[in-house]
Regions:
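Short, small-residue-biased leader/transition segments that mark boundaries at the very start
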Residues: 2-7
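Surface-exposed amphipathic alpha-helices with a cationic face
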Residues: 65-72, 149
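Conserved phosphate/ATP/ADP-binding segment of small-molecule kinases
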Residues: 74, 88-182
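Short beta-strand/loop segments at the ligand-binding rim of alpha/beta enzyme cores
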Residues: 75-82
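Structural motif
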Residues: 19-21, 46-48, 79, 110, ...
Length: 262
């Protein structure tokens, strides 16, 4: 039987370095036709995929496209975290062509400037470098968002996380959402005692999906929920965000400094 995907991480006094061991994993060997997607998606409301799946093998990319097309035919909301991972794209392929086709079916896109550039060649345009850092960041992301929505007309929202690294254990964390008309920005959280930042992006996306389902008419609330949920994840060891809805909402309603209360 095939092994599960494995990544390894060591705690030392330097930046995190992830080592992937996904070759010959079960996911890398999945092929179109192996799963009954119509039955799997029965009563489903949402399907999410990440850029890691098509990166690990051609067959997993083909299976991902199969799932996405069936989900689309069934009227299911589709989201992606573009997740560019250079170490994973090892097989001979046209990465931009693969990711463009997969992303064309998406309603919600999560990614940063690097994801957009590496996957689609999209870069910020006409940015005034004389503006202060925060304004340049927001302006550059707006430029990327507008290009992404032009390239992928089905998409309704483009989202990114903003991480400022003060040190290995102290980060500033926030998020931005653009819906084609308005840009929403969350408050910033000062995370001063990071336990584990691995899984921060996944917990953000999980929180965003929850927020968009439960607050469908309130982009700001959905974004704030996602950022608060992922902020709490930084205080938990491992991938899983072991927090409750009540804990996330409590942090959302906390003081303006956004400091995590332990």
């Amino acid at each position: 039987s095939a092994a599960s995907d494995v990544y390894k991480r060591q705690a030392v006094n330097r930046a995190s370095k992830v080592i992937y061991d996904r070759s010959n994993s079960a996911m890398s060997q999945i092929e179109p036709g192996m799963l009954d997607w119509k039955n799997i998606f029965k009563n489903a409301q949402w399907f999410h995929w990440t850029g890691i799946t098509p990166a690990i093998s051609k067959s997993s990319a083909d299976a991902c496209l199969e799932a996405i097309k069936i989900a689309s035919d069934m009227g299911i909301t589709i989201s992606t975290d573009l997740n560019y991972r250079e170490k994973l794209w090892k097989y001979d392929c046209d990465r931009e062509k693969i990711m463009t086709e997969l992303t064309s079916y998406c309603d919600i896109i999560l990614g940063n400037e690097e994801d957009a550039e590496k996957h689609f060649g999209i870069k910020p345009e006409a940015i005034d470098v004389n503006k202060n850092g925060e304004n340049v960041k927001a302006e550059s992301f707006l430029s990327v968002c507008e290009q992404m929505l032009n390239k992928f007309p089905r998409a309704k929202k483009v989202i990114t996380t903003l991480r400022g690294s003060i040190s290995a254990s102290h980060n500033v964390w926030s998020g931005i959402l653009f819906d084609g008309k308005n840009m929403f920005k969350s408050k910033e959280y000062q995370i001063t005692h990071i336990v584990d930042r691995v899984g921060g992006g996944d917990s953000f996306m999980a929180g965003l999906i929850y927020g968009l389902i439960h607050f469908p008419e309130d982009n700001q609330m959905a974004l704030d929920y996602a950022v608060a949920a992922s902020c709490l994840k930084h205080t938990i060891k491992g991938d899983a965000n072991l927090v409750t809805i009540a804990e996330v909402k409590k942090l959302m309603s906390g003081d303006a400094s956004g400091r995590v209360v332990r």
